[in-house]
A protein has these predicted regions:
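Solvent-exposed loop/turn segments flanking beta-strands in beta-repeat/beta-sandwich domains
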Residues: 136-164
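Substrate-binding cleft of secreted/luminal carbohydrate-active enzymes
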Residues: 1-14, 22-108
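A structural signal for short secondary-structure junctions
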Residues: 27-31, 66-69, 124-125, 142-144, ...
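Beta-strand-rich modules
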Residues: 154, 177-185
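Short beta-strand segments within Ig-like beta-sandwich modules, predominantly Fibronectin type-III
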Residues: 166-172
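Short, solvent-exposed loop/turn elements at domain surfaces
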Residues: 45, 83-84, 131, 141, ...
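Pro/Thr/Ser/Gly-rich low-complexity, intrinsically disordered linker/stalk tracts
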Residues: 87-144
Length: 185
């Protein structure tokens, strides 16, 4: 279904250079999604050869994002991210992954998207405004919608569903309580 090579070494490692390995995997991923396995501690404990005042996280992220076949990364081990070793989690949240990510498409498994939601309406409740919708119908279990993405755009703003900065929620529910500030939803 997908590839997650454990490229746990650092850029410049004499036996297993991260740069060489990621390029090899980017070329040989066999037309399947490619996510890079990152070793958090090696990344934050090794200096960037081009900028010794910082760790290797910026260089690795730049390299990953420069390769179109690399669709993301997985961090090992999770506790190092939770514990914010070397400000790793902070950098992910503030610099690299500020907005929610959607589950990548897998057209080789199923290329039929669920239908569009229907009967979208806002209802005032005792807790404030809530957006409701009806799930699209599907004949096959694989074609059912299981999550919904709620975006927010200003009235005069052009809708761009590729701009993740407008995602306010990803939910399995058929409703979303709208934020209500200063008389605006």
């Amino acid at each position: 279904d997908y590839n997650i090579p454990q490229i746990y070494w650092e850029i410049g490692h004499p036996a297993a250079d991260y740069d060489n390995l990621i390029h090899w995997w980017a070329k040989h991923a066999a037309s399947r999604p490619l996510f890079i396995g990152q070793d958090v501690m090696r990344t934050v404990n090794k200096a960037d050869a081009r900028n010794p005042l910082q760790n290797q996280m910026p260089a690795k992220m730049k390299l990953q994002r420069s390769l179109p076949t690399v669709q993301g990364s997985c961090q090992w081990y999770a506790a190092a991210v939770v514990d914010n070793a070397g400000n790793y989690r902070t950098m992910l949240e503030k610099e690299y992954h500020r907005y929610p990510a959607l589950i990548p498409e897998s057209p080789f498994m199923d290329d039929k998207a669920p239908g569009k939601v229907k009967k979208v309406k806002m209802v005032w409740t005792y807790e404030g405004p809530v957006l409701f919708w009806t799930a699209p119908k599907a004949k096959d279990e694989m074609d059912k919608a299981v999550q919904y993405v709620v975006y927010r755009f200003d009235k005069k703003e052009k809708v761009n569903l590729d701009d993740a900065s407008h995602i306010v929620a990803i939910t399995r529910d058929h409703f979303y309580p709208l934020p209500y500030n200063d008389g605006k939803t």
